[in-house]
Amino acid sequence: MNTNVAFGKKGEDMASAFLKKCGYQILRRNYRSGNNEIDLITKKDNIVAFVEVKTRHNLNYGHPAEAVTLSKQKELIKAAQNFINDNPSQGVDYRFDVVAIILDESKRNAFNEPCEDIFFIEDAFRTLP
């Protein structure tokens, strides 16, 4: 497996575990719609969240959340619309979240685990009316 792909999967695994601890149910991972993909689709109470996960080793190229550009948002919106059409639900609200992770594997904590920072941005962006 490509090292970037493996690193991204590790970030998605961390985000999934983090969201579960926060009370979210993971409905789908890596939902594909055409060329677009949603990393995680979660649910808590009556909210279904489409979650984009961005993981970086450090801040040399900016904060991971900055990588969720307008064009990426449009791709996520298209995929989410297809998911909603294929999985209609009554009484459910939808939103887009971002989990940004900085995972510095060169630094270790007291348990000899890589140092990590997880940033959870609820309702990170909205669709246009």
Curated annotation (Swiss-Prot):
Q: Which SUPFAM superfamilies does the protein's record reference? A: Restriction endonuclease-like
Which GO terms label this protein's molecular function in UniProt? nucleic acid binding
Q: Which Pfam families match?
A: UPF0102
Q: Which domain of life is it from?
A: Bacteria
Q: Which CDD domains match?
A: PoNe_Nuclease
Gene3D superfamilies documented for this protein: 3.40.1350.10
Q: Which family does it belong to?
A: Belongs to the UPF0102 family.
Q: What is this protein called?
A: UPF0102 protein Ctha_1382
Name its species.
Answer: Chloroherpeton thalassium (strain ATCC 35110 / GB-78)
